[in-house]
Amino acid sequence: MESHNVSNSLNLDMEMDQEKAFDYSKRAQWLRAAVLGANDGLVSTASLMMGVGAVKQDVKVMILSGFAGLVAGACSMAIGEFVSVYSQYDIEVAQMKRENGGQVEKEKLPSPMQAAAASALAFSLGAIVPLMAAAFVKDYHVRIGAIVAAVTLALVMFGWLGAVLGKAPVFKSSARVLIGGWLAMAVTFGLTKLIGTHSL
């Protein structure tokens, strides 16, 4: 009985040590790309739709502009992330070869494809939110309110998800994402509204 308890205690200690030893920084690359992509998808697509709506309040025009922003943004995010992470990959490979006598530990290297896919997928998921919020609302002002409300909820959700996956403080992460999204949306909407008003 005593040996059984000792064995269970050892197993629990080993599990705790493994959890502590787990390097959460390994998640950082794709997590950073995913959070960045989601925020960009939410904010840029919503701002684009609201900006276009300031000039032409037709729901079809707003949806088409948002869809175009989704496709272009997802491609841009994926390509940019792939190039960026691949540059980092090459640098780390060269450094490993110098330090390890030509040996490369691939499991420690960032994945360009993973980062690019996460970025594009997250952007698309984020961009769908304002599209769906605006799709079934006929009144322009109600439509804008629905977009802002949906984007706000989505920003909080993505901030919470990023904090949970990265083992970071939930409140700080969610607040940072939400405030940043609001600021970006306000600036982009204000500028596009100004341009549309003055017909520049």
Curated annotation (Swiss-Prot):
It catalyses: Fe(2+)(in) = Fe(2+)(out). The chain crosses the membrane at residues 35-55, 63-83, 117-137, 144-164, 177-197. Induction: Down-regulated under iron deficiency. Induced by iron supply. It is a multi-pass membrane protein. It is found in: Vacuole membrane. Pfam families: VIT1 (PF01988). Keywords: Ion transport, Iron, Iron transport, Membrane, Transmembrane, Transmembrane helix, Transport, Vacuole. Its main location: membrane. It comes from the Eukaryota. InterPro entries: Ccc1_fam. One of its GO terms (biological process) is response to iron ion. Expressed in the vascular bundles of the shoot and the stele of the root. Expressed in inflorescences and at lower levels in leaves. Residues 1-34, 84-116, 165-176 are cytoplasmic. GO terms for molecular function: iron ion transmembrane transporter activity; manganese ion transmembrane transporter activity. Residues 56-62, 138-143, 198-200 are vacuolar. Coiled coil: none annotated. One of its GO terms (cellular component) is vacuolar membrane. Belongs to the CCC1 family. Vacuolar iron transporter involved in the transfer of iron ions from the cytosol to the vacuole for intracellular iron storage. Involved in regulation of cellular iron homeostasis. Vacuolar iron storage is required for seed embryo and seedling development. Can mediate sequestration of iron ions into vacuoles when expressed in the yeast ccc1 mutant. This is Vacuolar iron transporter homolog 1. The gene is VTL1.
